[in-house]
Amino acid sequence: MKNEKLKVDNHIHNNIQFIDCLEFWVSNAKSFIKSFLQPMNFEVIGTRFNDERSRIQYLLLNNVISRSNLQNQFQIENNSYIKPIQGNQFIKVTSSISPNDLDFHSKIQKHGDFIQNISFYCNDINLAYNKSINNGAKSVQLPMKEYFKNCKDIVETAIIESPFKDLQHTFINRNITSFDDNNNNNYDNNKEIFGNPLFLYPEFQEIKDKELFKIEKEDSSSINGCTGSLDHIATCIKNGEMNYFVEWYRKCLGFKLLSDKDSVATDESENFENELILDKNFYVITKSDFKYTKKENIGLKMAVLSNQPLNTSFHKTPPIQFVISEAIQGGEGQIEQFIHYFGGEGVQHLAFNSNNIFKAVEIAKSQKLEFVYIPQSYYSKLDERLKHLFPNSIPKILKENLMKFGILIDSDAITNTNENNSNNNNNNDSQNNTEINQNIGYIKQIFTKYINDRPTMFFELIERSNALGFGKGNIIALFESLEKESSGSQLKSD
């Protein structure tokens, strides 16, 4: 039984629509959730064991109104789809409870806590799977259907290996019809259904121990949206591998290099997708860009892949963005450091959207989540560095909040001037303020400290104000801050 196709947003050119779920493999799930995910407004809503009962898995969702009552609080379309405007993201956290689970324990020993699976919601999983396999991807699981609730609910999945070792990609599609009696199940009469988010994950059971992950927090109306959907996934690869990874995602998943509207191809040709254009869709940062690092051989090459459309007349932040950072030859920076301690190439950090980054950081810090320290010297140079964005000077209240919470700010590499960009936030900094150049987008970012003892994975919060790309200045500031932390020279706890 085939479910109705989703209404495809005009900013998506691809069968692959958005990132459905991220799966962590961690050594201690409860500790990981309480230490890192709950401070970013994620709530545990479900749990399950695998068939062998050797692993336990928790399902988390952010912006949950009430974990004690999940009914009628979640917007679902086409019996299968979460409306992205809600700013939600599902995460699975998996941990082994068996000493004999050698595959799990060997990978944790090699990588530490890490991202093991990135799931993509697809209109047609067979199309996505066949395209990837025909272009060289390796199969993990053939397309299959799982039936739940007396065969009323159907979840289709297929799994492939990604080009990153020990990272898999799942293609998923749903046909969920068994809503509760309070909802009208007739799709023709109800284009949007409000229900329990667990309807979309029927293999999970609602968590029984309501006290297990209970935390004291502010009223949900004041914090929802502080941490939203995934903005981008940042990865690290070895020197000389950029073309291979770009080609793999282009051919196997149909992604393209993120660029501004003047550079978007006007037809379905693949020539543009395959071309790395310096300072358009491909960036190089060298030692000369750094002012405060002591290391001599430091830098990176960076490209951003996305499911941005091939032909568009306007900007809109794509729902999928993969940042690929390549190490330099003989380098000593954070990219090379990640590869060494992680045991190869992989996901370095996840960035989540925020509609109020100051509030999000305040809440996270109140729950003991630690962020990298940004030296005051960074803020002393802001007026000069961002003169093109703030012709007079940075508004006083904005600068004070940036310094108070340790947040970076930069104009993006690709400016988005589209007023209808629903993925970007309202520009709270410029309301009734003529001091901002409205034609230039900008971003505010902050990064957590490493979540492992190894200097490998961390998280990011990002607030976009009419911005599409990434700021080069913030990348440099992050490099220098992480160098201080990993070298042990950072004595101050933020």
Curated annotation (Swiss-Prot):
GO terms for molecular function: 4-hydroxyphenylpyruvate dioxygenase activity; metal ion binding. CDD domains: HPPD_C_like, HPPD_N_like. Its cofactor is Fe cation. InterPro entries: 4OHPhenylPyrv_dOase (IPR005956), 4OHPhenylPyrv_dOase_C (IPR041735), 4OHPhenylPyrv_dOase_N (IPR041736), Glyas_Bleomycin-R_OHBP_Dase (IPR029068), Glyas_Fos-R_dOase_dom (IPR004360), VOC (IPR037523). Disulfide bonds: none annotated. Binds 1 Fe cation per subunit. One of its GO terms (biological process) is tyrosine catabolic process. Its EC number is 1.13.-.-. The keyword Lipid biosynthesis does not apply. Pfam families: Glyoxalase (PF00903). Residues 18-174, 229-408 form the VOC domain. Keywords: Dioxygenase, Iron, Metal-binding, Oxidoreductase, Repeat. May have dioxygenase activity. Belongs to the 4HPPD family. PANTHER family: 4-HYDROXYPHENYLPYRUVATE DIOXYGENASE, VOC DOMAIN-CONTAINING PROTEIN. This is Uncharacterized 4-hydroxyphenylpyruvate dioxygenase-like protein.
